[in-house]
Amino acid sequence: MKQEKTVSPTVENNRSAESRLSQCDLDECFDESHDRDEEVLGSMTDAVYSLLKGVGEDPEREGLLLTPERVAKSLRFLTKGYRQDPEQLLKKAVFTESYDEMVLVKDIDIYSMCEHHMLPFFGKAHVAYIPDGKIVGLSKIPRVVEVFARRLQVQERLTQQIRDAIQNVLNPRGVAVVIEATHMCMVMRGVEKQNAVTTTSAMSGDFMTSQSTRSEFLRLIGNH
């Protein structure tokens, strides 16, 4: 009679961990356990409760009973980029390739929050690089944009961080990033200019030194 092999819980747990890590190799990977940290979520929930009282609301009324926890969970999601490593994400999909012309991913949706008022800003990012023996999986470029956007930001720094991450990992002949965004801190408050759009750029290598390369990039994103 054939005996069935039994697998210890430890082995099963190790296999589960390996499977999870393998999935992280394919997708964005971050410390999920940190998201489930009840102590952090609890302190954030208490803080939102105090804010509601501070603006003159009653956190105990029916419509607001679950609001503190909902807001805390939303903020954890909107700032998940702090718990992700964009350069490690890029390194998981780097390939040797002789292609040496511009690679452009444009019209990447971005949603972030300004660090001054914690109000949203949103728009489009356009990212290009010129390979020097290495390319990266195309989906990783929007993912890197997402990682940096899901933090408290200023648009200027966000633009530079995207450029620097790609430059550091691929060491290409050049990187170009342009972001066009609407800032709710300018729309809902302050100057209240509903149609104002902020454009920032960060470039390196050939995009800095070659006018024709820079012009090609701007033409391709429709900004010339």
UniProtKB/Swiss-Prot annotation:
EC number(s) on file: 3.5.4.16
GO BP terms: one-carbon metabolic process; tetrahydrobiopterin biosynthetic process; tetrahydrofolate biosynthetic process
Gene: folE
Pathway noted in the entry: Cofactor biosynthesis; 7,8-dihydroneopterin triphosphate biosynthesis; 7,8-dihydroneopterin triphosphate from GTP: step 1/1
GO molecular function: GTP binding; GTP cyclohydrolase I activity; zinc ion binding
Record bears the keyword Metal-binding: yes
Protein's UniProt name: GTP cyclohydrolase 1
Subunit structure as annotated in this protein's UniProt entry: Toroid-shaped homodecamer, composed of two pentamers of five dimers.
Binding sites annotated in the UniProt record for Zn(2+): 114, 117, 185
A Pfam family recorded for this sequence: GTP_cyclohydroI
Name of the top EC class for this enzyme: hydrolase
Native source organism of the sequence: Chlorobaculum tepidum (strain ATCC 49652 / DSM 12025 / NBRC 103806 / TLS) (Chlorobium tepidum)
